[in-house]
Amino acid sequence: MDAVEPGGRGWASMLACRLWKAISRALFAEFLATGLYVFFGVGSVMRWPTALPSVLQIAITFNLVTAMAVQVTWKASGAHANPAVTLAFLVGSHISLPRAVAYVAAQLVGATVGAALLYGVMPGDIRETLGINVVRNSVSTGQAVAVELLLTLQLVLCVFASTDSRQTSGSPATMIGISVALGHLIGIHFTGCSMNPARSFGPAIIIGKFTVHWVFWVGPLMGALLASLIYNFVLFPDTKTLAQRLAILTGTVEVGTGAGAGAEPLKKESQPGSGAVEMESV
């Protein structure tokens, strides 16, 4: 890349162009994965008068759509499709802050589009609540937050374990799908099982109902944060220095060599045994 005068407009333009080139494909992948997840997953929750959905049916559907979304978008973006997962990768120094912000934006837009499409194809008497997450009357908001925290904790731990570059066997799509199904089998009676703020956000914004919506952000994000700390600093601590973590945070270093988004790194750090997930930073 040609040199650009530091401090000038050219420098800012170069950074903006470089950032967009690095993540545009990944942003579409996150948009697509989250949209599909919401359309098919939330679609399984719709209460048809002649065939009410069972918990098992809902869990299996979320399992299958998760596995599909991960398989389809894995090589393009790392298949987060979940702001909580993106936060966990950010905290674990597997992804830069600019990429994380862009991912979350793409996920929320994808979830909204997926929910809008579902709303559009559903009959009027079926789509009234559009499968929004709600806290059961007998469950307090504190209990709901705790449940969402624990459900997301196990999901994010599974995501890290499944995508760790040191893993030589197993299918991330299969294992992450199973983890999502597990969460639904337990959590659906408490909160409808979110584990994913985007999943809750899309339907809520389409029908305009945000009752205790904060629960479905606070619980999953806290669970993701805790899972990232446990996996990256307790179970499998890596050797990254503070300087390396700051470089990753700001997007000046590439992490991993596998399922990235096609970034051309300013600098590539090799860290054998660091446990870096196969994910590129901007």
From Swiss-Prot:
UniProt protein name: Aquaporin-6
Pfam family, one: MIP
Membrane-side (Cytoplasmic) residue stretches: 1-25, 74-78, 89-99, 163-168, 235-282
Reactions mediated catalytically: nitrate(in) = nitrate(out); iodide(out) = iodide(in); bromide(in) = bromide(out); chloride(in) = chloride(out)
Protein family (similarity comment): Belongs to the MIP/aquaporin (TC 1.A.8) family.
UniProt key word Transferase: no
One GO location term (cellular component): cytoplasmic vesicle membrane
Extracellular compartment segments: 47-54, 122-141, 189-192, 206-213
Keywords: Cytoplasmic vesicle, Membrane, Repeat, Transmembrane, Transmembrane helix, Transport
Keyword Membrane tagged: yes
Region (Disordered): 260-282
Motif (NPA 1) on chain: 82-84
The protein's role, per its UniProt record: Aquaporins form homotetrameric transmembrane channels, with each monomer independently mediating water transport across the plasma membrane along its osmotic gradient. Unlike classical aquaporins, AQP6 is an intracellular channel with selective anion permeability, particularly for nitrate, and exhibits very low water permeability. It may also facilitate the transport of gases, such as CO2 and NH4(+), as demonstrated in vitro.
Provenance organism: Homo sapiens
Entry's free-text remark on domains: Aquaporins contain two tandem repeats each containing three membrane-spanning domains and a pore-forming loop with the signature motif Asn-Pro-Ala (NPA).
GO biological process, one term: odontogenesis
Top-level taxon: Eukaryota
Bilayer disposition of the protein: Multi-pass membrane protein
Membrane-crossing residue ranges in chain numbering: 26-46, 55-73, 100-121, 142-162, 169-188, 214-234
